UniProtKB/Swiss-Prot annotation:
Name of the protein in question: Nitrogenase iron protein 1
EC category name: oxidoreductase
Residues binding [4Fe-4S] cluster: C97, C132
Alphabetized Gene3D superfamilies for the sequence: P-loop containing nucleotide triphosphate hydrolases (3.40.50.300)
Residues modified as ADP-ribosylarginine: R100
Record-listed ATP binding positions: G9, K10, G11, G12, I13, G14, K15, S16
Cofactor(s) annotated in UniProt: [4Fe-4S] cluster
Modifications made to the protein after synthesis: The reversible ADP-ribosylation of Arg-100 inactivates the nitrogenase reductase and regulates nitrogenase activity.
Record carries keyword Coiled coil: no
Keywords linked to the UniProt accession: 4Fe-4S, ADP-ribosylation, ATP-binding, Iron, Iron-sulfur, Metal-binding, Nitrogen fixation, Nucleotide-binding, Oxidoreductase
Catalytic activity reported: N2 + 8 reduced [2Fe-2S]-[ferredoxin] + 16 ATP + 16 H2O = H2 + 8 oxidized [2Fe-2S]-[ferredoxin] + 2 NH4(+) + 16 ADP + 16 phosphate + 6 H(+)
SUPFAM superfamilies to which the protein is assigned, alphabetical: P-loop containing nucleoside triphosphate hydrolases
Organism whose genome encodes this protein: Methanothermobacter thermautotrophicus (strain ATCC 29096 / DSM 1053 / JCM 10044 / NBRC 100330 / Delta H) (Methanobacterium thermoautotrophicum)
Amino acid sequence: MVRKIAIYGKGGIGKSTTQQNTAAAMSYFHGKNVMIHGCDPKADSTRLILGGKMQTTMMDTLRELGEVACTPDKVIETGFGGIKCVESGGPEPGVGCAGRGVITAITLMERHGVYEKDLDFVFFDVLGDVVCGGFAMPVRDGKAEEIYIVASGEMMALYAANNICKGMVKYARQSGVRLGGIICNSRNVDGEKELLEEFCERIGTQMIHFVPRDNIVQKAEFNKKSVIEFDPECNQSQEYRELARKIIENKDFVIPEPMTMDEMEELVVKYGVMD
C-alpha cells in the first residue's frame, strides 16, 4: 500500500532539496517506486529529478486546456530513477489563491487514481511555513498520513516547525495524520544537534536524521541533479540513503505537543540561538 508523506518546513530551509534527494535515495538505493507532488507555486519541487527542467504545472494546464483535458499524461513527467513528478503550480501573480490550486490539483490526481498506481511512496512537498487552508490540505483532509518537518538549529526554523505542529494538532484526530519526525538540515550552528534533540524531546517526537552540511549539495544543484545522481558514492549520498532507510522503516508516529512561546524563548536562550 502506498505511503503518503507531506514534507513541511520554513521557507529557505532546504526542504525541496532534502525531499528530492531523499526521494532519489529511496529509488536508487532502496528500489522504491516514488512520486513527488509539488505543492508550491514556485513549482521547484521536482527540478533536480528532471535535470533542471521546470515542468508545466497543473494550474497552467488547467488554464490552457480546461479540466477535461488536464489528464495525468499531460502533467506527469518521469525523471531520475523512474520518479514520477507533478507540480500543482498556482494562480497568476496577484490573482487568486495558491492554496486553492493545491486543493484542485490533489483532487484531480485522486480522481484519476494516480496515487495508487504501482507506487510505494508519494511525497507532497508543501510551501514553506504557511499552514493556511489550501496548504494544510494534505494534513487536514488526510491526503498524507505522515508528516516530516525539515528544520535546523536556527531560531526561525524552530518557530516554524513548532507552528506546523500546532496546525497538525488541530487536524490530527479527524484526519489520522501523524508526525514521523524532524529532519535536521544542518546549518553548522553551534550546539545544533543538541538543540534539535531537545526540541524533538519536548514536542514528543524524534529527530529522524541529522543531515550534515556539505558543499556537494550546491555543486549537484549547479549541475541540475540530485546528489544521488551526481555522485552516488559520496558521503552526502550515504546520508540521504540513511535518511531514506529510516523513513522506510519508521514506526514512530505521534501527535506532537507543541511548545508555548515562553518555552520556545527559554529553549533558544538556553542554546544562545540567533538567526
